[in-house]
Design a protein with these regions (language model features):
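Glycan-processing catalytic domains of CAZymes
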Residues: 2-188
Length: 188
């Protein structure tokens, strides 16, 4: 179990880990076959003088997060550069999960050994970054109390993992947009 609580453990460097770099059926439907965020990276064009785009990825290239060797290489690279943990984006839409495969495989395999936590990205998916912000692809609501319970139960496997980051013995879970919650969680 990874815990913090002493002065020596109080400061950690955590990198946000966006799981959008592998294809999923929903993105195939919404954006076209084989779509990942790499499509936008590769298509980026400079917007002003000196703007260097596309910004092609470094030594790992246009990686695919379905591959265990990619996730392990990312962890090695992160550790080499002083990253202590990954904070995986977690998507939950009233029981529907999206982009969960990389973290599910990390849990199942036990690799990489790098500590982790999650950030619940609790907002609807829209075409906002494509200039069509009013088109909702998948809605996000705070949900009923039954949905809260189902979500909490779904997180138990994550927070029970010995690599899961804790503060004062308690699992740390970030909420991307806490202001979007319709009622307080009652958590401490």
């Amino acid at each position: 179990m990874v815990t913090t609580g002493t002065t020596a453990d109080a400061l950690r460097t955590i990198a946000f880990y966006l799981p959008q770099y592998h294809p999923i059926p929903e993105n195939d439907q919404w954006w076209g076959p084989g779509y990942t965020e790499w499509n936008k990276v590769a298509a980026a064009r400079p917007q002003f003088r000196g703007h260097r785009l596309p910004d092609v990825p470094g030594e790992l290239g246009f990686y695919d997060l379905r591959l265990p060797e990619v996730r392990e290489a990312q962890a090695r690279l992160a550790s080499t550069h002083g990253i202590d943990a990954f904070c995986y984006y977690h998507y939950w839409f009233q029981g529907k999960r999206l982009l969960q495969r990389p973290l599910a495989e990390v849990l199942a395999s036990g690799e990489p050994r790098l500590p982790f936590l999650i950030c619940w990205a609790n907002e609807p998916w829209t075409r906002a970054w494509d200039g069509l912000s009013d088109e909702v692809l998948i809605e996000q609501t705070s949900g009923s109390s039954a949905d809260w319970e189902r979500h909490a139960r779904a997180l138990l496997e994550l927070v029970a993992d010995p690599r899961y980051l804790r503060v004062g013995g308690r699992p740390m879970i970030l909420v991307y947009r806490a202001g979007r919650l319709s009622e307080p969680l009652g958590l401490t």
